[in-house]
Amino acid sequence: MKNPNLLKYVFRVLPGILFLFSATAKLIGIDAFEIYLFSFGWFSLGTSFVLARLVIAAEYTLGLLLLANLCPKTAWWGAVAMLAGFSVFLGWLALSGNRENCNCFGELVNLNPVQSLVKNLVMLLILLPAYGVQPFQCRFKKLWITLMAVVPLAAVLIVSPPDNWRYSAYDRSEPVNRQAFQEALDQGLLPASLVEGDRVVCFYSLKCRFCKLSARKIVTLRERGEFSEAPLIAVFGRGENTDTTEFLEETGITFDEIHFLEPDDFLLITNGAFPVIAILHDGDITAVYNYRNLH
């Protein structure tokens, strides 16, 4: 080929585009990505929030650096290191029998660890002939490289700031209608066990994505001893389907009691927004959370 440098650059384009797509997919489904990281129990919830955004920003930066080709060696080694690191992690998941979505492409593309590991190996093979490409020349080269390193992180934090940065703002909202809750309790619409000592009651919808994510969050928080160990009671809004099997299997949560509430009463208590998680003592609400401030 007359221009071998062009051929080497072509082999950088696909990994660069895939890094950008992977980062965008994770950002779109960042709530699921956060909970996925948190579910391993290696990091605190707040650390998981920050780590998720650092991974996304790093992928954006690598994708941009690969395509811009202004510092090819740094971009190449960075991409290889990230793919190799992820591959070791995915290999461990595969060997441990994990077949869940590994969130490599967020929730847009469901890949299990084995499938994602194959994808990473293919990307590494594609990157091999891209080594040694000559950098493009442009004015203000150092400035562009700096911007590609800094802007992605700043943009991710602006578009999706970590929830723990905004707990005080979330705490000012009232996700539960306390009067409607008390009336439902007095009328026997809610289980009598709610007035017996400490209880955690979760107002969920079976198909609600954030209800499922909050359930997964509760599971990990309790495993770490960071959430109430009181009996866990689910109150689902009644719909055509009352089979909780899929919800329980997807989230891994175990309830001590499961109840259903008519839609009008359910929406009145939750102010039309769910999930709502209430901490009770003898029927009195002592703390209440939505998905965002649940910690």
Task: Identify the residue ranges that each predicted region occupies.
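Thiol/disulfide oxidoreductase modules built on the thioredoxin-like
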Residues: P263-H295
